[in-house]
């Protein structure tokens, strides 16, 4: 199986706009940013469900898989941007990702017996 390699273009994009991100945080404040994050997370969930519909076709949609993929990427970017503006703890997120990947991989190896 091919290993997925992750680049750093997202971090670079956030670094390039660091001053603007700080300004957005100052202007909107934590409460409004949390509301925005919740809204964008909801839109991401809807985009993922729409993408699923384009792939399995059990409940057809006129949206193409390409359009659904672009929409999913846009909503994911919106969630990441909101999280970045809120100042999420990258080290903590990285630690959690490592734990969750290990747990997910282990469950799959064990045949999802302890989900």
Q: What is each residue range found by the language model?
A:
Residues 2-76, 80-115:
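Flexible "arm" and connector segments at domain edges
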């Amino acid at each position: 199986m091919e290993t997925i390699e992750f680049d750093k273009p997202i971090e670079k994009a956030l670094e390039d706009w660091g001053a603007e991100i700080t300004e957005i945080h100052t202007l909107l404040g934590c409460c409004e940013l949390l509301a925005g994050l919740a809204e964008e997370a909801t839109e991401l969930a809807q985009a993922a469900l729409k993408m699923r519909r384009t792939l399995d076709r059990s409940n057809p949609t006129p949206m193409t898989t390409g359009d659904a993929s672009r929409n999913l990427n846009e909503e994911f970017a919106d969630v990441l941007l909101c999280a970045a503006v809120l100042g999420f703890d990258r080290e903590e997120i990285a630690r959690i990702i490592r734990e969750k990947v290990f747990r997910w991989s282990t469950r799959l190896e064990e045949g999802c017996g302890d989900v």
